Each structure stands twice: as structure tokens, then as C-alpha cells.
């Protein structure tokens, strides 16, 4: 059976057409049998009802076709076959069912991990572009599989895609941070992004840095409250977070810092601090250290 467009319905449309033909035949029969008793207003109402039914059916078919198009775009297995083969309705629905079963088997992690889903589609798109590059080099440029330029380019793109997929897999394995205590005590956070606080940079020896680190961990040490957040040149904000267990910050501020550490994007492109603030903090002439977050702590 030849169809007019990609998503023309087959069985359901035939049934609906048969029902419409039956209704129209019944209406025509009633019209022929009771022609004398039917007024022109009644016949116009019947025609208007048939016209409305056709409009409603067309809108319903368009809604079904749009939903199938969205499923073909959202399901990864159907998205891979988008340019290579024409998919039937049953195939799209079957791929959708298989995809949902796979997500259910994985424990529902894919339902809520929007970043992982975006990375999945980015990897699929990169692989599609890689296949198009290889096809262009072989068909348009006439390069065979042993050509040095093609081998070098394709291997470079393959290695890049593999490295990004491995990095994304390692990055999305990080979960949320649970609180270990109430607000009356210091919460203990064991998160891989909350690294230990580095001591003040010293180029003299390793022992001096270790000694400064132990001074920061002492309860009465004045350096325990003077550690400042500094954004490194590479933009990784997680490596400069202070030790949470010995910090005097309130839990709401700590939760905001933890959410910043779990943010999947880099802050290297955002100018958060001036270059002068990247240097270690120096005491002011009054003897008190500079605390850029002092007003925020007072707000809590």
C-alpha cells in the first residue's frame, strides 16, 4: 500500500474511513427515504457535522505524527537511524519501549540526569559528524582507507571522542552530597570534589607547607577562619574549596559551595574575581585579615 507521506496512518485511518462512509451512507439513505420530511436546515447541519469531523480527524493525525517525530528525535536508537533508513510507526514505538525498558533496568538514573542525557546526544552527534567526514573523504576527495591523511584525521577524531566519553562517564558518576549532622554541629561531608585545603604557597621547603597546614587544622589557630576562595587559572573551583570539617561557615553557605562544586561546567570563562585576588591574602594594616565573605556569614 503506497502512502502519501511519512507518517500516514494505515489501519486506523481505514477503519475511520469505513465508519465515515457508513455514517454518510446511512445519512444519505435517511435523506433519500425521508426526503419529504427533512428541511434544508437539517441537511446543512449534517454537512457541517461531517466537515467538523474531518477537521477533528486531521488534527488528531497531525498530533500523532508530531509525537512520533519527537520520539524519533529523542530515542537514541531511532536518532541514529534517522538519515539512513525510513522508520515505520511500529519501529519507532518499539524503539521507544526498548529505550524505556533500558532506563528502567538501569535504576531510573537516566530519567533525572539531564546532563548525562545531553552528553549522550553530544557523543552521538560527534560520531555522526565523524562518519560524515569519513564518507566525504572517501566519496568526494577520493581517499581510500590507507591514505595517511585520512587515517591520521579519523584516528585523531576517534581518540578525541573516546576521551570525552570516558571523561563524561567519570564525571557523571558523582552523586549528591548528604549532610552528616544537624545544624548544631559541623557537618561532615565526604565528597570527592571537596578536596583538602592547601596551605599558603611557600617556595622554601615542603616541611613549612606541612606545618602551616597543621596550624590551619588547630581549633584556636587564627588561620582556620582566614582561608579565602580563589579561582585558579584553569577554572576548576572544586580544588580551592576549604576544609569543611574545620570550617566555621554556616551550613546554608556550605550547601551553596557544595552545589557549586557539583556544577558540571567550568568557571574558567567567567571573570568571577579580579587578578589581584588570585594572590594569597595579606593582612591589612589594622592587623585583621581580609574576609571577602564576612558580610555573607553575618547574613546567615
Curated annotation (Swiss-Prot):
It comes from the Eukaryota. The keyword Protein biosynthesis does not apply. Residues 48-103 form the bHLH domain. PROSITE patterns: BHLH (PS50888), ORANGE (PS51054). InterPro entries: bHLH_dom (IPR011598), HES_HEY (IPR050370), HLH_DNA-bd_sf (IPR036638), Orange_dom (IPR003650). Residues 32-44, 199-210 have a biased composition (Low complexity). Belongs to the HEY family. This is Hairy/enhancer-of-split related with YRPW motif protein 1. It comes from Xenopus tropicalis. The gene is hey1.
Amino acid at each position: 500500500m503506497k502512502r502519501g507521506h511519512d507518517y500516514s496512518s494505515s489501519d486506523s485511518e481505514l477503519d475511520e474511513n469505513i465508519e465515515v462512509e457508513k455514517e454518510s451512507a446511512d445519512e444519505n439513505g435517511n435523506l433519500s427515504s425521508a426526503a419529504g420530511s427533512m428541511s434544508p436546515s437539517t441537511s446543512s447541519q449534517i454537512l457541517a457535522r461531517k466537515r467538523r469531523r474531518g477537521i477533528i480527524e486531521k488534527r488528531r493525525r497531525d498530533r500523532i505524527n508530531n509525537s512520533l517525530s519527537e520520539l524519533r528525535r529523542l530515542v537514541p536508537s531511532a536518532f541514529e537511524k534517522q538519515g539512513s533508513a525510513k522508520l515505520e510507526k511500529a519501529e519507532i514505538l518499539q524503539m521507544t519501549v526498548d529505550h524505556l525498558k533500558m532506563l528502567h533496568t538501569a535504576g531510573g538514573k537516566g530519567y533525572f540526569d539531564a546532563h548525562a542525557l545531553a552528553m549522550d546526544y553530544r557523543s552521538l552527534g560527534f560520531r555522526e559528524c565523524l562518519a560524515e567526514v569519513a564518507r566525504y573523504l572517501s566519496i568526494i576527495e577520493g581517499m581510500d582507507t590507507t591514505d595517511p591523511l585520512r587515517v591520521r584525521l579519523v584516528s585523531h577524531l576517534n581518540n578525541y571522542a573516546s576521551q570525552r566519553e570516558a571523561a563524561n562517564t567519570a564525571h557523571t558518576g558523582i552523586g549528591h552530597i548528604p549532610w552528616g549532622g544537624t545544624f548544631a554541629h559541623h557537618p561532615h561531608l565526604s565528597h570527592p570534589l571537596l578536596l583538602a585545603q592547601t596551605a599558603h604557597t611557600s617556595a622554601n621547603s615542603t616541611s613549612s607547607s606541612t606545618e602551616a597546614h597543621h596550624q590551619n587544622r588547630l581549633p584556636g589557630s587564627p588561620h582556620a577562619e582566614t582561608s579565602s576562595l580563589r579561582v585558579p587559572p584553569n577554572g576548576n573551583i572544586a580544588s580551592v574549596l576549604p576544609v569543611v570539617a574545620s570550617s566555621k561557615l554556616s551550613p546554608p553557605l556550605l550547601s551553596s559551595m557544595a552545589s557549586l562544586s557539583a556544577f558540571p561546567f567550568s568557571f574558567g570563562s567567567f571573570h568571577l574575581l579580579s587578578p589581584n585576588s588570585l594572590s594569597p591574602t595579606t593582612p591589612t594594616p589594622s592587623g585583621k585579615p581580609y574576609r571577602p565573605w564576612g558580610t555573607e556569614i553575618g547574613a546567615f
